[in-house]
Amino acid sequence: MGKNVVVLGTQWGDEGKGKVVDLLTDKASLVVRYQGGHNAGHTLVIDGEKTVLHLIPSGVLRDNVKCVIGNGVVLSPEALMREIGMLEARGVPVRERLLISAACPLILPFHVALDVARETARGDKPIGTTGRGIGPAYEDKVARRGLRVGDLFNPELFAAKLEEVLEYHNFTLVNYYKVDAVDFQKTFDDAMAVADILKAMIVDVTELLDQTRLAGDNILFEGAQGTLLDIDHGTYPYVTSSNTTAGGVATGAGFGPLHLDYVLGIIKAYTTRVGSGPFPTELYDGLDKQDPVGKHLGDKGHEFGATTGRLRRTGWLDAVAMRRAVQINSISGFCLTKLDVLDGLETLKICTGYKLEDGTVTNVTPLAAEGYEKVTPIYEEMPGWSENTVGVTSLDGLPKAAIDYVKRIEELTGVPVDIISTGPDRVETMILRNPFA
């Protein structure tokens, strides 16, 4: 029998999921995106060549893999066509490998306009969205007024639905945010221009997944963003608009949760965050916080967002938050990424608890952003190492201090580290236990 594996982020995104998904897809038949949209940025480096994907699953560069976009993904036709064009220009036969659920909500120009207008109106207190219309598209889905991919194939129905929802949103754009209305005819024409292209890729995702499972083939589910950005379990309201946790697989792909065999949590050897929101172990943000260790992490780790290009805030590893990620996702094993970025640091710190305002200590995360902003991290110090770990592919090749750091993460979280990444390239990895084995 095959195995069904979930790969997801355990922090605030940017943990290195793209590389890991690409690495594991040599054993998978399907790679499935189940939430998010083109706000995700998954970077792959293969033989020195860099590819950044935002919407299409990271398995698209593999000949043996079909890539699936499930119903939980909000889909921008414009972004999809741009990504298809980029890959086809490099000789990748995307349309032969990509399958899409007709139930995917569409991201249309008025969603982007709303997203940008709202962030602008928040002034110096933005949520930190990518401005790509993700949140407004999910809002329309929940409000049951959104258009879906399947609507594109009935032009009359699409036009009627578009006219209704556009009237609703244009009223807000013009009268509340004082920006221009979105044009109906251009929105309609642009959508119809890609309808036939998308129609050729439509599939019943639930049926496909079940038949693949019954055939004994492996399925890999690729998460976007990270656990601490989950709409329900993250640092609300500084979160994304979807469920980034393992439960999102069932709802966002239509796959029964009892069929999941392994959840791989991607954990960076330190912590980063893009945009606004609490960050207890933060060291460096390029503005108010200027700790040299944090700058080292950002510079050596090339910490700039793959989607937005924004500087990522950096800080020490937070084991309290990691324990919560383990609880929510029932994580089977970790993939520890960017261990090499810690090379050269004399002392390392891991947050093992939070001190509250009244002086009490807890190892439980707060329920919302307001609680996070009031905690002080409690650190455990460990010796660092001076040796170079870039490209090391066996535990024996790591310095003792690095091995001790890995073991301490396992002890604090109760989860084994099954994969260690020591560089951006596919080959700069040690697999201690393969999730598909």
Swiss-Prot record:
Binding site for substrate: 306-312
Enzyme's top EC category: ligase
UniProt binding sites for GTP: 13-19, 41-43, 312, 338-340, 421-423
Claim: Metal-binding is one of the keywords in the record: yes
Catalysis performed (reactions): IMP + L-aspartate + GTP = N(6)-(1,2-dicarboxyethyl)-AMP + GDP + phosphate + 2 H(+)
Free-text comment on the cofactor: Binds 1 Mg(2+) ion per subunit.
Annotated catalytic residues: 14, 42
Cofactor(s) annotated in UniProt: Mg(2+)
Gene Ontology molecular function: adenylosuccinate synthase activity; GTP binding; magnesium ion binding
Signal peptide: none
Binding, IMP: 14-17, 39-42, 130, 144, 225, 240, 310
Primary localization class, coarse: cytoplasm
One GO process term, biological-process aspect: IMP metabolic process
Superkingdom per UniProt: Bacteria
One GO CC annotation: cytoplasm
E.C. number(s) listed in UniProt: 6.3.4.4
Described function: Plays an important role in the de novo pathway of purine nucleotide biosynthesis. Catalyzes the first committed step in the biosynthesis of AMP from IMP.
HAMAP family: Adenylosucc_synth
Record's protein name: Adenylosuccinate synthetase 1
